[in-house]
Every structure is written in structure tokens, then in C-alpha cells.
UniProtKB/Swiss-Prot annotation:
The active site is at D65 (proton acceptor). Keywords: Endonuclease, Hydrolase, Metal-binding, Nuclease, tRNA processing, Zinc. It comes from Clostridium tetani (strain Massachusetts / E88). One of its GO terms (molecular function) is zinc ion binding. Its cofactor is Zn(2+). This is Ribonuclease Z. It catalyses: Endonucleolytic cleavage of RNA, removing extra 3' nucleotides from tRNA precursor, generating 3' termini of tRNAs. A 3'-hydroxy group is left at the tRNA terminus and a 5'-phosphoryl group is left at the trailer molecule. The gene is rnz.
Amino acid sequence: MIDITLLGTGGGMPTPERNLSAAILNYKGRKILIDCGEGTQVSMKISKTGFKNIDIICITHWHGDHIVGLPGLLATMGNSGRKEPLTIIGPVGIGEIIKGLTVIVPYIPYELNVIEATKESLCFTINKENLLLSSKGEIIINTLEVEHSSPCIAYRFDVKRKPKFNLEKALDNKVPKVIWNLLQRGGNVEFEGNLYESSMVLGEERKGIKFSFVTDTLPIPELIPFVKKSDLLICESNYGQDSDVDKAIKNKHMTFSQAAQIAKSGEVKELILTHFSPAIEDPEEFIHFAKDIFPKAQIGKDRMIISIDFQN
């Protein structure tokens, strides 16, 4: 199971009801923060999500409402005794932005590993201490360049699930019992002059979890295959009414109905709308624009928690 907590659902500027863009993914006690807008630390405190186990921060782009909370969070992590490296992922150019932001945080007592997102997937293995970049892993982070007024990327998180041990296969393949546990972890094992593969003891691959996060973009066609069959899509919906579509095009954002159409065309299971313009006092007033297209659409609220279970 994974948990996603919306820490901020506002866009442009904070309001009394909404902090700026941020969400946190929790899997097996390790955490990935997505964006870090103003108010992120306060929302973490209220929701009790904490920041000590954050291994990766994924930044969609460097507009202030998505990143201005980052220097303060980095400082708080350092002041709280963090020594472990922290990975920051973002669009091309994020490295220079991080350098600029950290001018006001001159001392960071841990390593920052900045990855300017490529078109290749990033795989991470997970253990009790951290998430580590590797050639294979339980969590795969995928990115897509979207269309906004600055370089911006959407994220998809594929959480893999290990196949079950298959006793019948292990016996049929005459795999020595002493190496069963090693093979269950994946990879090959050489034993007494013979090479054994993990596929010799494991069953079929099981369905994992797919979570997509899309913000600050026009509804480009490439989004549909990118979010295809996601268990959850969190998608920006800066404008509520269909009559605001010209504003959305001008500012390179989406309306409620455009976000819903992405969800419908992408055959996602659940849609949470976020990144509401400060001009929208109550997003629920406009939810029918989304539900008419995608009935499972919901309004995202600060500190809302969404849990997704593995199936079967």
C-alpha cells in the first residue's frame, strides 16, 4: 500500500484554506515529496507526515508556488540532524535554480544529489534507511515534458510488486533449498558450479501501483498515454468553468473539464483535482464540470490522504 498526502492544493498564491503545491508519497516508511510550495512545512506539521524519511524531492518546475518552500525545508532538515544524502529531481535547469535558492541556506550538512530529468526512467530500491538509485528497483519514476511558461515535467510513479515464491517451480527446476531466499530477492546465484536464475523460483509478475502527478500544463495529447491506467491521477485544474478556457490557454493551465477528459481518455481509476486559482473560493461549486465527464473526480483538499492498496 502507498499513501499520498496532499500538503497544498493552491496555485499562484496561498489562501487561508489552501497552501501552495505539494504532495508526499509514503511507501514502506520512505517518502517522496512532490513540489515544495509555500506552507509545505506547516502542512507537514499539521498532518504529521514528517520530513525525516524524505529521500527524494521531485520538482515539477521552478515557479515560486511550487518551489519557494524548498530552502526552508532544506534548512530544517539540516537543523534536525540530517546527514543522509537527499536526491532532488527536476526539469532541465533545476541545478542552477537549486544553487540560487540555497544561497540563503549557506550550510547544508548533507549531500544534495540533483538530477535534471531525462526521458529515461529512474529506478530506486528501497530499504529501511533510504531509497537508492539503481538499475532495477521497486519504485520507478517516469517524467514527461509538458507545456507551460517555464520548463515543466509531469511525474508518474510505478511501484513494482515482487512475484510470489513458487514452490512447484523451485522443485521442478531442482533448485537447492539453501539458495531459495537469495533467488527470491532477484538476480542470479551461482552455487556448486551451477547458475540459478530468480525466474526458476518465482511466479508471475504481480500488478503494482501507478500514480501520476500532473500540474501546470496545457492538456497536451502526450499526457494520455503517460497517465494510462493510473490508479490515481492528481491533476491541476486551475480554472473551474469551461468559459475560462481562453484564460487557461493563455496561461498554459487546465480547466476542470480538461483535467477530467485527460482522466477519462487515460482510463485512470481515480482523479483528484488540485492547483486551484486563488480566485476560486470553493472548488466544489465547479466539480460538476469534471464529474459530467469523469464521475470519479474529486476535489483535492489540503492534508487529504489517499491510500492505494495492491490488488490480488
